[in-house]
Design a protein with these regions (language model features):
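Mobile beta-alpha loop/short-helix "lid" or hinge segments that flank ligand
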Residues: 37-49, 105-106, 139-159
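Short alpha-helical linear motifs
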Residues: 112-114, 134, 153-154, 189-196
């Protein structure tokens, strides 16, 4: 059975660099045999604001929570807005508080690959750091490689969504591989312990 890698990333702008970066990293996991689901900008923009005092959930909210619940790994991409995570991405992450009572709480035991796109290196670095802090707080394992892409430096993607920057494409492929490799190893470790 193939592993499920869930991608969360995008903006309200169709074809945003953060959405395309997450798609590129997910494609690398697919090439190595993973199944993927991507929650992009349009989907994320339609989610209601997370309100912990309101337990009712829309079908879209339930779909996101259930996908992350079933995920063997995640790839999260955010634009760097004013040095931090976009509200769209943070709202989706906040919704995952619904996983607090699960046997596998939040991101527990899962690798989380992180991608940041911004029009400048400062926002890239601060946003990546913020995302790593969030993943740690949610008991996830940020991958060793976090990808930051400066959209002011070069054209990152072609009109068809193909990554135009070779170095960026290589980094996104490596990120996807790290997430999937961790999922494979983590799944094998409990089986080895049970067999011992």
């Amino acid at each position: 059975m193939s592993h499920l890698i869930v991608g969360i990333g995008g903006t309200t702008r169709p074809g945003s660099s953060s959405e395309l970066a997450v798609r590129t990293a997910l494609a690398a996991t697919e090439r190595s045999g993973a199944r993927t689901v991507h929650f992009g900008g349009d989907f994320l923009a339609a989610l209601p604001h997370y309100a912990p005092e309101r337990p009712e959930r829309t079908d879209e909210q339930k779909r996101l929570v259930e996908a992350v619940r079933q995920a063997d790994g995640l790839i999260i991409g955010s634009p760097g807005y004013h040095g931090g995570i976009s509200g769209l991405i943070k709202n989706a992450i906040d919704l995952l508080e619904d996983l607090r009572d699960d046997q596998r709480v939040y991101f527990d035991g899962r690798a989380v690959g992180l991608v940041v796109t911004a029009a400048g290196w400062q926002a890239c670095g601060t946003t990546l750091s913020a995302l790593r802090n969030v993943v740690h707080a949610m008991r996830g394992w940020p991958t060793p490689l976090g990808v930051t892409l400066n959209s002011a430096r070069t054209r990152l993607f072609e009109a068809d969504g193909t990554c135009a920057d070779t170095a960026a494409a290589d980094q996104l492929a490596m990120l996807g591989s790290q997430v999937h490799d961790f999922a494979l190893r983590h799944a094998a470790a409990p089986a080895a312990v049970r067999a011992a």
